[in-house]
Amino acid sequence: MLFRFPCVTRFFQRWQQHADPHDIVAHFPVSLRTVQRWFARFEQRGDDGIAPDYHQCGQQQVQQTAPPLVEHLCQTRRDHPRWGAEMIRLELEDHYDTVPCARTVQRHLGHAGLQPAPAGRTPAAVYPRVPRAERPHQRWQMDASEDLRLKGPQRVCWLRVVDECSGAFLKTVVFAAARWEHVDRHQIQEGLRQVFAGWGLPEQFRVDNGYPWGSTGEFPPEMALWLIGLGIEMVWIPPACPQQNGVVERAQGTGQNWAAPQTCGHLAELQQRCDELERRQRERYPYRDGRSRWDVYPTLHQACRKYRRRAERSAWDVSKVWAAVAQHVVKRRVDCTGSVSLYHRTRYVGKPHIGKAVYVSLDPSGPTWVFADEAGNELRTHAADELTAERICSLSVAGRKGKRS
């Protein structure tokens, strides 16, 4: 046996002499990792590790896939044409004790003439890499998708929340409105409370600049203020840069492929299907080395900061809101009445400043709105009576335009 594999035999002899793998690499055209693997093999088997394991090569299939199971998996592809082999296999696990691997599922689909599921979209350009969260619940991403057609004439929209580190689908809340901007802000708030009740509070939220938490250089809107008061740091991506919210953007496409809203008869059916598929994606869908996200990230099961609806008011901190707003300075142009608008509430600055630019900031000690000219001279102050805990939590910070405060 020692002479049939001369190169391996030399490795074995060097291993017996306790040689350094780095020295062997210097004399043989092999990688360090290869030598280390051979040494580990000799350590485990001795001289029996010299011969190759030809008898163990390849996979042996115990039995062929039963025809009813093959027909079931093919019918599943017909019913869900955008499902991949892994998702079909997980669907079969709910009905059979033993199911074939994903590669076998692909082979049966090919023999049946069923085209493979469409691949994901490839990026059109190379974008700057955005640092990703390093642990579960460090940062969540959320995004809305609208105008989702159901089986009938009804159209709905949904809000999807995804953990940035693991990519786990945490919750999708479906709303009856077709347009996202038509969903009442209080319904969105209650939807987020559902997410918090099930998962706790994240450290950060990464969002875009759309309704109802968008901020394009202005003061944070009332929905963002409410989240900040819960101790959640808001991270706004630059305008027109959805790739910086890429985890949830990809989840939106995958979620629509899996849930297939057009096959649901009503909103409740779509909501139930989303809940089931999200649980499957977290707990069973292969993510890394065949393991699910649930197994790869044990801390994904629950965020460190728990949330209880009844204790929200006692845990909510208005001082965090004032500190966050105080970091912003907003430019305004004084109108013909000598006033400017803040949160759709009119604030009087003075008629001598009509047509001039003023800069508005918040003094958190009051809290007080401070109006200054371009030179930094203070012009006027107003009590920030709209930034109370009661108004922020009830999402009634913003008033109607033209109403004097």
Set out the residue ranges of the language-model regions:
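C-terminal, beta-rich DNA-binding module of retroviral/retroelements integrases
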Residues: 282-405
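Short alpha-helical "recognition helix" segments of helix-turn-helix
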Residues: 23-28, 88
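Short, amphipathic alpha-helical "recognition" segments used to contact nucleic acids or chromatin
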Residues: 2-19, 70-79
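A short acidic/small-residue loop/turn micro-motif
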Residues: 163-164, 175-183, 386-387
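Key DNA-contact positions within bacterial/archaeal DNA-binding proteins
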Residues: 33, 37, 103
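Mobile-element integrase/transposase regions
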Residues: 63, 98-99, 109-168, 182-194, ...
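Basic, flexible linker segments flanking DNA-binding modules
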Residues: 49-142, 147, 299-302
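Charged alpha-helix within mobile-element recombinases
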Residues: 173, 216, 223-315, 364
